[in-house]
Amino acid sequence: MSGNRAVIALLDRAQTDSDAGQSEAAGASLERALRIEPRNPWLWFELAQLRLAQGQYAQAITLARKSNSFSGRQYRVQAENWRVIARARVSQGDAAGADQAFKRASDLEQQAGAEKDRDAGFHAQ
């Protein structure tokens, strides 16, 4: 996710705060981490998850999409983001949109698995 010690410490703090029900403090830690690594898709994903848990569905969708914009070929984080989008759409009453998002997540998960298998075969040669 990150090799930056400050970012790792902020992620740990965000998790501790979230576990303690301090979602605002968790969000502040994630936002600080994003100021250090603004193009880190995993940080955007973590913030999207937090906003989803807070019931901020439109914000969660926006953040998940932003994460995807920085994800490149990181299919796992893309799949996780599409799951956030799907759950937000369910909560918004958009069943059709949720189904599409869950399908996209599943497709990306398969793509990530296929790439992992291909890489394992390449390294075994």
Where are these regions (language model features)?
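Alpha-helical segment of the N-proximal tetratricopeptide repeat
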Residues: 3-28
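TPR alpha-solenoid repeat register
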Residues: 43, 50, 77, 81, ...
